[in-house]
Amino acid sequence: MSRVKGGTVTHARHKKVLKAAKGYYGRRKSSFKVATQAVDKANQYATRDRKARKRNFRALWIQRINAAVRSHDEALTYSRFINGLNLAGIEVDRKVLADLAVHEPEAFGAIVAQAQAALAA
């Protein structure tokens, strides 16, 4: 039986890691051993930050909605506005509400008025 050497597989694996490390600084882009560690850590950060991005955007949307609600009525808070939306039966998510607040303030104002009416009733 002939001897099997893993040269092509090893070369392909090294090439894949070094390609992923392209743009890194110093030996992180050229040394396989250091590049492997750098790419592994980068993948850990990427996984963590995909989860964090969802939290960050939700927080941003809430801040934008709160600011827009308070610009329409100083006494109305974000939490009371969301309660008013639920009472009025308006099912618009925070992403769309934040987009309306920024790009179409008059439409957002109409939604605020409906929420206030539901709270008053």
Swiss-Prot record:
GO molecular function: any one? structural constituent of ribosome
Q: What is this protein called?
A: Large ribosomal subunit protein bL20
UniProt similarity note: Belongs to the bacterial ribosomal protein bL20 family.
Disulphide-bridged cysteine pairs: none
Phylogenetic lineage: Bacteria, Pseudomonadati, Pseudomonadota, Alphaproteobacteria, Rhodobacterales
The task this protein performs is described as: Binds directly to 23S ribosomal RNA and is necessary for the in vitro assembly process of the 50S ribosomal subunit. It is not involved in the protein synthesizing functions of that subunit.
Alphabetical keyword list: Ribonucleoprotein, Ribosomal protein, RNA-binding, rRNA-binding
Q: May I have one GO cellular component term?
A: ribosome
NCBIfam families per UniProt? rplT_bact (TIGR01032)
